[in-house]
């Protein structure tokens, strides 16, 4: 009787999907960033050795911002990183292992890596800036690397965004009719 139950449990566990496997939408930052990095290496004809890839990844991460910089921090490719698991990226990439598999292995080492998601992009050509929150308006300026000194009210942020839009989002600025 116990053997039958044990067999039933073993069968049930073998049929259920592995919870560690990546689902669609998992590790989106990891997969896209490492995919771009791998393509950049191929385009520049870089030698695929672990040491070279490690050096190139550190250089590539210096340009990273936002969620991609956080990914670089988690894998140890930034100067202020606490842990260093960069070899978990460089060795598999040297053997041309797909980035999805690399991210799956990184997820097992540090689950935070796959929890990173890109922020939702705001379509500036169609959005009504008056309906956005001040936090979202600040985020737009921050993404552009700008600050609004002296802005106290929502209208100040909207005015600043409208001033800078031709510089940072020229297509959106030309598409807007409320200017």
Curated annotation (Swiss-Prot):
TM ranges: none
Entry remark concerning the domains of this protein: The N-terminal region may be responsible for neurotrophic activity while the C-terminal region may play a role in the ER stress response.
Source organism phylogeny: Eukaryota, Metazoa, Chordata, Craniata, Vertebrata
Source organism superkingdom: Eukaryota
Disruption phenotype: Homozygous knockout mice are embryonically lethal, embryos delivered by cesarean section show reduced alveolar volume and fail to initiate respiration. In an inducible knockout model, young mice with induced muscle injury show reduced density and cross-sectional area of new myofibers formed at 4 days post injury (dpi) and persistent necrotic myofibers within the regenerating tissue.
InterPro entries attached to this UniProt entry: ARMET-like, ARMET_C, ARMET_N, SAP_dom_sf
Pfam families: ARMET_C, ARMET_N
GO biological process: regulation of response to endoplasmic reticulum stress; response to unfolded protein; vasoconstriction of artery involved in ischemic response to lowering of systemic arterial blood pressure
Tissue-by-tissue expression: Strongly expressed in pancreatic islets and spermatocytes (at protein level). Expressed in chondrocytes in cartilage (at protein level). Expressed in prorepair macrophages in damaged skeletal muscles, expression decreases as animals age (at protein level).
Task of the protein: Selectively promotes the survival of dopaminergic neurons of the ventral mid-brain. Modulates GABAergic transmission to the dopaminergic neurons of the substantia nigra. Enhances spontaneous, as well as evoked, GABAergic inhibitory postsynaptic currents in dopaminergic neurons. Inhibits cell proliferation and endoplasmic reticulum (ER) stress-induced cell death. Retained in the ER/sarcoplasmic reticulum (SR) through association with the endoplasmic reticulum chaperone protein HSPA5 under normal conditions.
Alphabetical keyword list: Disulfide bond, Endoplasmic reticulum, Growth factor, Lipid-binding, Phosphoprotein, Sarcoplasmic reticulum, Secreted, Signal, Stress response, Unfolded protein response
GO molecular-function term, one example from the UniProt record: growth factor activity
SUBUNIT field: Interacts directly (via SAP domain) with HSPA5/BiP; the interaction inhibits ATP binding to HSPA5/BiP and subsequent nucleotide exchange. Component of a complex containing at least CRELD2, MANF, MATN3 and PDIA4. Interacts (via C-terminus) with ERN1 (via luminal domain); the interaction is decreased in the presence of increasing concentrations of Ca(2+).
Effect noted on mutating residue 153 to A: Abolishes inhibition of HSPA5 ATP nucleotide exchange
Residues covered by region (Interacts with ERN1, EIF2AK3 and ATF6): 93-155
Source organism of this protein record: Mus musculus (Mouse)
Modified residues (Phosphotyrosine): 73
Keyword check for Disulfide bond: yes
Protein name as catalogued: Mesencephalic astrocyte-derived neurotrophic factor
Keyword Lipid biosynthesis on entry: no
